[in-house]
Amino acid sequence: MQTGAITSYIDVAQLTLYAFWVFFAGLIYYLHRENKREGYPLIDERVGQAKVEGFPFVPGPKGFLQSDGSVVLVPRAEPADVVNGRPIAAWPGAPLAPKGDPMLSGMGPGAWAQHRADVPDHCFDDHGPKIVPLRTVPDFFLAWEDPKVLGMAVLGLDGVQAGTVVDAWIDRSEVVIRYLEVELAPPAGTGRVLLPMNFMTMKPKLRQVRTNTILAEQFAAVPKTRDNETVTMLEEEKIMAYYGGGLMYATARRQEPLL
C-alpha cells in the first residue's frame, strides 16, 4: 500500500463530517459565551434579585481598543440601572408604569442608556467633537438652496410657539444637521435646548418648525447640555429619550389604547 493511502481503510468523508461537527459545536459555544459579555448576569426578580448566568458562564474581562486609543473592559462592574417604574400587576414580567414625570422616567419610548459615556462623540480624522453648532465651524454653512431655518418659530404639538431657532448643530463626520438650537420663550421658560431633526417638520412658507412629540410648555424640561458648544453621548441619549417619551406621555390621551 502506498504511503498516505488511508482512504482504503478510513472513511475520510465521515471523519471530515465529525470534525465539522466538533468545530461547529465549539463555534456555537464560543459565540454564545461572547454574547454574555454585556447584559449578564441576568437578574431574576422572582427570587429576591438572584443573579442568573446559565451555561456557559459569563466570560472573564476582555479589553476592546477604541478609536480614541482607550481600552474598554467587558464585562465590568457597573451600577444597576435605576428603574423609575412600578409593575402594574403582581405576576413576574408585568409591564411597568412610570413613576413621577413619565417624560423623564426613562420608561417605554422614553428609555435611554444610563451607562452611556458622558463625553462627546469624536470624528475619526481629527478626533474633535463630532456634533457642534454651526457658529463654531466656519468651514460649514447651510446651502443657499435650503430653507433659511434660522429665525423660524418653533411650535409644539398644541400649536403654541415655544421659541425661535437660533442655530443648527451639525455632524461633521456625516455632514448633516442633527439638531436645531431653540431659544425658548414663555410658556416654555428660558434658555436654549436642542430639537432633534427627526422629531420635527419644517414649514418654510410659514417660517415655522413644528414637532408633534411635546407641548410648547414641555420644552422647559428638555435635558440641557453641560457645554454650550458640545453635546455628550449621554446627553444625546437623554434628549432623544425626552422627545421619544412625548410620543406616549406628552398628553394623557396618548397613554390610552386606541380601541
Q: Which stretches of residues belong to each language-model region?
A:
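Peripheral interaction segments used for macromolecular assembly
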Residues: 1-259
